[in-house]
Amino acid sequence: MDTAELSKVDDGWTVLTFAAAYGLEKVCEALIPKMSEQAINHVDKDGNTALTWAAYTGLEKVCEALIPKMSDQAINHVNSDGNTALSIARNKGFKNMCDLLTTIEATKQNEIQTNLKLTTTKTSHEKLIEAIEARNEAEAQNLIVHMDTAELSKVNNDDWTALTFAAAYGLEKVCELLIPKMTDQVINHVDKDGDTALTWAASSGLEKICEALIPKMTEQTINQLTDNNDTVLTLAANKSLGKICEILIPKMTDQAINQVNKDGNTALIAAASSHLEKICEALIPKMSDQAINHINNYGNTALIAAASSGLEKVCETLIPKMTEQAINQANHQCDTALIFAVRNSLKKVCEVLIPKMSYEAINCWSTNSFWFGFTAFTWVTLNGDKKICELLIPKTSPEVIIDILKLTKEKQFIIEAINSCNKTSPEVIINILKLAKEKQFMIEAINNYNNKLVKELNLILDENNPNNAIKMIRAVKIYKKLFKEYLTVEKTENFKPLQNTIEDFIKNNFFTAAGVCKNLIPKIDNNEIHISCLTTEIIAHIVEYLENEKWGLEVETLG
């Protein structure tokens, strides 16, 4: 029979394990030279080998013949009873077999110890990496001095060089020693995470190391993206390395300059967040509209970041380039660019932003834990900026204005701003009138509001248009709502004097319904506008308003 036939396994057994189990010494001796190595080392389903069976049946010579042909694993295999060939031989008293197995074990242990010694004898490169990881700069520097370029340029199993380790651990002096001794290829090495020594140096804020590395880097590695989609420019901006950013920008591709990382940040957002005004000004002309208007994962735009950092010029440069959505953007804490601009007293920015912003965005209130509930108007009241206050009032909700007036002690400048604002809504004035302490102040605001409507009315009448009457009645409705709503709400005796004052004001003020009629008379007499221009229905409406206000004299004037 040939080797292939003899080496077959049947039900987990070979002919050799059968012969050994049955104690057939001569059969075993004849089989061993003809069996394959795999068959000799075969382990049956009970964990026994031909060697363990030979030991059980006392075939010492067969054991001695098998041992040199078997693997260490098969010799030391433990069967289902927990026995090895050596333990069986000891139980059986097979001295020669025990000595042989013990010698093999001792030899194996010596080999293990020798290998351990070899593996524990560390190379200079391994020692250097250990020193860097331990941040032992003195030890690392001492090792570098005695190492050649080939040793220093090795890449370890984690795809790191000594230089990337030193840069990642922020060891500036170690990096300074390494750079002159390393090849350009290793300096430009990109690890499995997309990092280079330069990206690590930028991440660690090592300005001098970045300066030393950049001239040695290829265009490709300078524009390399990390696994977080960061460029070295974004990383340098994050660490406020303005000088490095200045050096990098001319070397970066358009794609790299407009790159968005996994946090949604661009180099521009990073630079603005780090107060790098010059870098922002250098980046903006090079960036696409899409990148300039990009919103990061936290809801911030470059404009919000610039306003937050107090970069007035950057904001002024950005605003004309921002979309309506980006200008009105509120971040995840509901802070807008306007809130930050007002908070940082960026008056010019506020003046440009406010007309461009929606009512909702202007009245957005912050959920930031440091200024929870603050709106742009809240910051105005804290900063005491009357001019910005005047700009905000027409777009600020009455509720916000009333709440601020109730809470703040310094009300005077707010009242003055309201008084000087021609666009204060009737609702705001009505609500402010309800604040007892502010009623006298608001008389001025009422006068202001009426005077503005008078001017508008005169302009309308000058147009000599029959539709003017309709516009006039709309104006009267606004006026009527302003006072009538207040008078119906406040009916206590305490408010009687003020009520009388307001009624007198109504009678004497130029822009009452009666005042409108008086204004019409000279124009009728001069044929500039004729009473026939007004329909009977419109005249009836005017008369109704006048009668409701009990102004009989003026009604008679109209006929």
UniProtKB/Swiss-Prot annotation:
Transmembrane intervals: none
ANK repeat windows: 11-40, 46-75, 81-110, 158-189, 228-257, 263-292, 298-327, 333-364, 372-402, 524-554
PROSITE patterns reported in the protein's UniProt record: ANK_REP_REGION (PS50297)
Tagged with keyword Repeat: yes
Pfam families: Ank_2
InterPro entries according to UniProt: Ankyrin_rpt (IPR002110), Ankyrin_rpt-contain_sf (IPR036770)
Record keywords: ANK repeat, Repeat
UniProt name for this protein: Putative ankyrin repeat protein RBE_0902
Species this protein is from: Rickettsia bellii (strain RML369-C)
Organism lineage string: Bacteria, Pseudomonadati, Pseudomonadota, Alphaproteobacteria, Rickettsiales
